[in-house]
Amino acid sequence: MKAHDGMYIDGAWRPAASGETIDVVNPVDEQVIDRVPAGTAEDVDAAVRAARAALPGWAATPPAERAARLAALRDVLVARKVEIAETVTAELGSPLAFSQAVHAGVPIAVAGSYAQLAATHAFEEKVGNSTVYQEPIGVVG
């Protein structure tokens, strides 16, 4: 059994504020396959604060660099696709082929799509006598 004892918040791994964990059970054989932190509202608030603090830097990052970072994320997801699919299959009991196509494949496609969008989207557009700027507006959630 693996044990993941932290959540990645504000650039660091940290335990849940509660100090508690949740067993992850394989639905096929009902064996505990992992243990993860039991996140709390306090943990969510910390993550949202960290995301809000990161926004100015991300908003100031040139679109080409954002695209490169999103493409790098896509590449990591591609490299770990089998591992992700096997983990999801163990957690959910879904068929491996489905986990590869959907649970691992869709995030790869989304990250790639967003990378392409960041590289090609017109974030500044002339409309009549006006200029419309599109920029990150904030944390959702």
Enumerate the language-model features and the residues they cover:
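N-terminal Rossmann-like NAD(P)+-binding subdomain of aldehyde/semialdehyde dehydrogenases
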Residues: 1-128
